[in-house]
């Protein structure tokens, strides 16, 4: 049976950590673990997901929850409550619902103080990892039989009814997801007509019916070329010479969004090397299966711009295609011939130096899953028996997650993010006796996860920004600063610093708090918005060069509403507790941030949320920022417009539910059937309470609270519903802890702001 291990280094000589692996999550298969009854419980969870996989696409993330509940012998002792029709919600019933939720959260807390959770969803994470390990000859050693079984379970679980796979688990079938998933099944041992319910046959039919694998988008073409089932001559150029560009040029690496820069870094190395894995009999067989015509008859040069219509979200502008054609026809032939090939050699060496730098500064985790696989492959190409490749192999378990829908690859983990919002939700409950043990552990985790140093050496020459004092999305070893994780980490530490240390532990050193403020201030743009990883400011026209057909706004760093809102909340609290630190800069930050929120509000009163779905999410965080600087419904038109938006989108059942299609279409779209989700309902409630809706008309809040209370399950959990996380306009991420954290937070604020505490309590 599968078991989750926390903060475990496994005595691997190729692993090292900056804080003794705090926050690390790894899964192991133990054939002797679990009783027959416990194993049957796991099988029942798998069967339940399978039977409902086309209704609720994301997993409930139940396997580790079952494990923790068993290990801690948790039993929900507080009776479940329900609100009947026409019944007035009482203070006691809300309190009981909250306490039930808190008790479950305590059982789910890991020993190091964080809540483990899945953070996945795209169909281009685990599949390329399988391809990489197949190429390097490590597939069976890294993924033994039980691992391969669970990866196949995951692939089968998310196959659409038409036989294809989407860009993410909720999406319509596309060539990219379908080709990668088909290849993944074949590399894991399924025959061309194998797989559960004819999975391979159905997938291959979808591929051939839609033009064959030649119609893959650019990333698909690259991965197929790496495997040897596509030719590099059929790809648009990815010249590593880009890494030689001086910083004053508008198209230099330092001008790019960090993720884009670091994905195309190893990709350009592999392109420059024209790297191709071993041409095995299976690879030769795949060449026959993936195309509608014989492989050797394909006109690769003319296929570079071919892409299935199902995959296109961001069509290439004509200017971009002209640029690729110029590089392809004029530049590449020169760079592969003497004497210009000396420049190519220098570029490859420079690119590899950057790869090693990023690997070392992230303890071989790298910034995320897409880059991780490519960097690992580049290190193998450099030296298959080298230490760098072995260090990469040692960090693969950090990315692997197992749930009832199988084994998948994480983005890299949401440990710090989930812990920080979870602590804030608990603090809002004011259930001091119930939450004290959780607060102490959570406080220690957040303190231990703060990044203590900047990247090594002359980090600016490596296009890196300051990170000292920041928090990452996952753990300290990851090393990559993130503005909203820093703002909520700072907020948690500030709030906990005002509480008795015997209850919540020793407060953080004020100098470390100030370091966090320095990072936040450094990431604000001239327009007042807060960027995510690095300062924004590159020219927007560079987005015309986005080569990725299925996502948008990836070339340069941008500002984000939710980062800005949490930044305002954090700095208002910091200013109150430390009024003398960079006073003018903090005041200026708040003024400019408010201006940014005013300027980015949509005509309907909402704000677009980049990292959650979508307008409900963005509006909640924007209202939090405005409320922090004492903007009110009475004195702020933006708040009045936002309230009208939220009230207008409330459903008949009292809740809110927003479709993921809002992200791509950039207009509010309710869920099919006007369904509500507990997470969207919680976000909307919190947003309305930021505006003091309870003082104007509490009825919308009563209706929403009733839905949340009645949705709570027998053990204190809430149901897993539609996916609520998103990124880059057209892709989704699954955050299963949201259903526990935001529901608790909303009910806590509802009890405090809307209901009156009975006399004597």
UniProtKB/Swiss-Prot annotation:
One of its GO terms (biological process) is triterpenoid biosynthetic process. Its EC number is 5.4.99.46. Keywords: Isomerase, Repeat. The keyword Nuclease does not apply. The keyword Nuclease does not apply. It catalyses: (S)-2,3-epoxysqualene = shionone. Coiled coil: none annotated. It comes from the Eukaryota. InterPro entries: SQ_cyclase_C, SQ_cyclase_N, Squalene_cyclase, Terpene_synthase_CS, Terpenoid_cyclase/PrenylTrfase. Expressed in stems, leaves and flowers. Lower expression in roots, stolons, rhizomes and radical leaves. The active site is at residue 484. GO terms for molecular function: beta-amyrin synthase activity; oxidosqualene cyclase activity. GO terms for cellular component: lipid droplet. PFTB repeats lie at residues 148-189, 513-555, 590-630, 639-680. Also produces small amounts of beta-amyrin, friedelin, dammara-20,24-dienol, and 4-epishionone. Belongs to the terpene cyclase/mutase family. This is Shionone synthase. It comes from Aster tataricus.
């Amino acid at each position: 049976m599968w078991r989750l291990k926390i903060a475990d280094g496994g005595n691997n000589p190729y692993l090292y950590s900056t804080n003794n692996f705090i926050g690390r999550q790894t899964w192991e298969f133990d054939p002797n673990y679990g009783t027959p009854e416990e194993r049957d419980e796991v099988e029942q969870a798998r069967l339940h997901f399978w039977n409902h996989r086309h209704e609720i696409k994301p997993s409930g993330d139940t396997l580790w929850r079952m494990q923790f509940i068993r290990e801690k012998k948790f039993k929900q002792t507080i009776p479940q409550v329900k609100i009947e029709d026409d019944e007035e919600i009482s203070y006691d019933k809300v309190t009981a619902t909250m306490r039930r939720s808190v008790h479950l959260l305590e059982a789910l807390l890991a020993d190091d103080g964080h809540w483990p959770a899945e953070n996945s969803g795209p169909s281009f994470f685990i599949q390329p990892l399988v391809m990489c390990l197949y190429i390097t000859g490590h597939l069976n050693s890294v993924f033994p039989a039980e691992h391969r079984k669970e990866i196949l379970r995951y692939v089968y679980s998310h196959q659409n009814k038409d036989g294809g796979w989407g860009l993410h688990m909720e999406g319509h079938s596309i060539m990219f997801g379908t080709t990668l998933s088909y290849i993944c099944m074949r590399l894991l041992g399924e025959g061309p007509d194998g797989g559960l319910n004819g999975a391979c046959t159905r997938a291959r039919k979808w591929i051939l019916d839609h033009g064959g694998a030649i119609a893959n988008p650019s990333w698909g073409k690259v991965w197929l070329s790496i495997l040897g089932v596509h030719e590099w001559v059929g790809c648009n150029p990815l010249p590593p010479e880009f890494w030689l560009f001086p910083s004053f040029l508008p198209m230099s690496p330092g001008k790019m969004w960090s993720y884009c820069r670091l994905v195309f870094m190893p990709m350009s190395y592999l392109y420059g090397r024209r790297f191709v894995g071993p041409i095995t009999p299976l690879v030769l067989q795949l060449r026959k299966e993936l195309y509608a015509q014989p492989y050797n008859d394909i006109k690769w040069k003319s296929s570079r711009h071919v892409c299935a219509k199902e995959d296109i979200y961001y069509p290439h502008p004509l200017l971009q295609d002209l640029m690729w054609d110029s590089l392809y026809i004029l530049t590449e032939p020169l760079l592969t011939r003497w004497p210009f090939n000396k420049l190519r050699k220098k570029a490859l060496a420079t690119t590899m130096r950057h790869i090693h730098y990023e690997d070392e500064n992230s303890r071989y985790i790298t910034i995320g899953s897409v880059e991780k696989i490519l960097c690992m492959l580049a290190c193998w190409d450099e030296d298959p028996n080298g230490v760098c490749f072995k260090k990469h192999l040692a960090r693969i378990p950090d990315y692997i997650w197992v749930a009832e829908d199988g084994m998948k690859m994480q983005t890299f983990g949401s440990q710090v993010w989930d812990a920080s919002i979870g602590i804030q939700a608990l603090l809002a409950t004011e259930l001091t006796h119930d939450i004290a043990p959780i607060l102490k552990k959570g406080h220690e985790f957040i303190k231990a996860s703060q990044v203590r140093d900047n990247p090594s050496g002359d980090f600016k020459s490596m296009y890196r920004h300051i990170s000292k004092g920041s928090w990452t999305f996952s753990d300290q070893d990851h090393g990559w600063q993130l503005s909203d994780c820093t703002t909520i980490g700072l907020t948690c530490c500030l709030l906990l610093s005002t509480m008795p240390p015997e209850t919540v532990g020793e407060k953080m050193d004020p100098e470390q708090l100030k370091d966090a403020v320095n990072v936040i201030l450094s990431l604000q743009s001239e327009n007042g918005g807060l960027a995510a990883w690095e300062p924004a400011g590159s020219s927007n026209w560079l987005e015309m060069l986005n080569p990725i057909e299925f996502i948008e706004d990836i070339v340069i760093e941008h500002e984000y509403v939710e980062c800005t809102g949490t930044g305002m909340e954090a700095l208002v609290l910091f200013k109150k507790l430390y009024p003398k630190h960079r006073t003018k800069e903090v005041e200026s930050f708040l003024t400019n941030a408010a201006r940014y929120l005013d300027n980015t509000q949509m005509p309907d009163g909402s704000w677009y949320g980049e990292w959650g779905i979508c307008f409900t999410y963005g509006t909640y965080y924007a209202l939090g920022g405005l409320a922090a600087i004492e903007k009110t419904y009475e004195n702020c038109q933006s708040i009045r417009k936002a309230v009208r938006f939220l009230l207008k989108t409330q459903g008949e059942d009292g809740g809110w539910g927003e479709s993921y299609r809002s992200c791509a279409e950039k207009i509010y779209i309710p869920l099919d059937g006007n369904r509500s989700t507990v997470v969207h309902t919680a976000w909307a409630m919190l947003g309305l309470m930021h505006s003091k809706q309870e003082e104007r008309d509490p009825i919308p809040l009563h209706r929403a609270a009733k839905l949340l209370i009645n949705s709570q399950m027998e053990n204190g959990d809430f149901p897993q519903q539609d996916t609520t996380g998103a990124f880059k306009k057209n892709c989704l991420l699954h955050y299963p802890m949201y259903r526990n954290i935001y529901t608790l937070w909303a009910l806590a604020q509802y009890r405090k702001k809307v209901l009156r505490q009975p006399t004597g309590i």
